[in-house]
């Protein structure tokens, strides 16, 4: 791409090898890009700051008063066709990973508790929508008698009319708070999905959908057992509490 840009702009064709050396000498390195949080305008930044410094302490205090689960929720789809990442290989030999080519994913709803690291999850083959989200939350409510404070993002079906009706019907035990827009970094369960992808999905071959499903369910069960691996995912909030103290 850089070679083509130079050719188009300056009419000079450099070899790829020379360009690599030139870029290294200029202080560049070949890196994998990462996603950055969007919405960095002043208004969005102020809403994020207010949520972290004002709203979050109130949510935490409410959960402590009620002895409630403080659950951060999110959903994810793990693709059968697999995913790629960096890995070590001999120079000149690009590694390859088999793929089924099947454009199908195993979906998972998840909630993790701030205080205990408890992990609630439900895998499904259906679509992620209001109906399946309500079924998951109903299952969670049935599994405990404790009050629940739910922190969720702004996915459209999280705030649909069906969900609003569901939340109202369970208001005695279930309190819902919305994360600010453009704030995946405020949702610790995103890190859990990343860990599962890194350990169990990247560079793996899933010839059948059941192979994927079994692999994902084993990973989910592992985190459900090992709460000590879930609790560190909340380090961002614990550090922010220390700064605000």
Q: Predicted segment positions?
A:
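C-terminal anion-handling pockets and recognition modules
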Residues: 66-70, 190-245
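RNase H-like two-metal-ion nuclease catalytic core shared by retroviral integrases
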Residues: 39, 153-154, 161, 177-199, ...
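Extended, low-complexity cationic-aromatic segments
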Residues: 10, 48-138, 237-244
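RNase H-like polynucleotidyl transferase catalytic core
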Residues: 94-101, 168-188, 205
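Short, solvent-exposed loop/turn segments at secondary-structure junctions
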Residues: 26-29, 75-79, 114-117, 155-158, ...
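Conserved short alpha-helical interface segments
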Residues: 1-41, 69, 76-78
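Mobile genetic element proteins and their domesticated derivatives, centered on retroelements
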Residues: 2, 19, 74, 110-111, ...
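RNase H-like DDE/DDD metal-dependent nuclease/strand-transfer catalytic core used by mobile genetic elements
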Residues: 81, 130-178
């Amino acid at each position: 791409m850089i070679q083509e840009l130079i050719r188009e702009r300056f009419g000079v064709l450099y070899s790829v090898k020379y360009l690599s050396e030139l870029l290294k000498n200029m202080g560049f390195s070949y890196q994998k890009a990462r996603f950055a949080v969007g919405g960095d305008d002043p208004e969005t930044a102020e809403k994020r700051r207010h949520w972290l410094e004002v709203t979050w302490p109130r949510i935490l205090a409410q959960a402590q008063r009620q002895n409630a689960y403080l659950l951060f929720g999110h959903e994810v789809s793990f693709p059968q066709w697999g995913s790629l990442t960096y890995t070590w290989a001999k120079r000149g030999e690009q590694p390859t990973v088999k793929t089924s080519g099947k454009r199908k994913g195993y979906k998972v709803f998840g909630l993790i508790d701030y205080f205990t690291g408890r992990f609630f999850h439900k895998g499904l083959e259906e679509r992620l929508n209001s109906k399946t989200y309500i079924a998951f939350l109903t299952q969670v409510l049935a599994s405990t008698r404790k009050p629940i404070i739910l922190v969720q993002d702004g996915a459209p079906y999280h705030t649909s009319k069906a969900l609003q009706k569901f939340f109202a019907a369970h208001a005695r035990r279930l309190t819902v708070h919305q994360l600010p827009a453009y704030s995946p970094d405020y949702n610790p369960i995103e890190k859990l999905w990343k860990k599962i992808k890194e350990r169990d999905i990247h560079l793996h071959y899933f010839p059948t959908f059941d192979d994927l499903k079994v692999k994902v369910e084993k990973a989910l069960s592992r985190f459900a057992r090992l709460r000590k691996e879930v609790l560190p995912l909340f380090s961002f909030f614990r550090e922010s509490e220390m700064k605000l103290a």
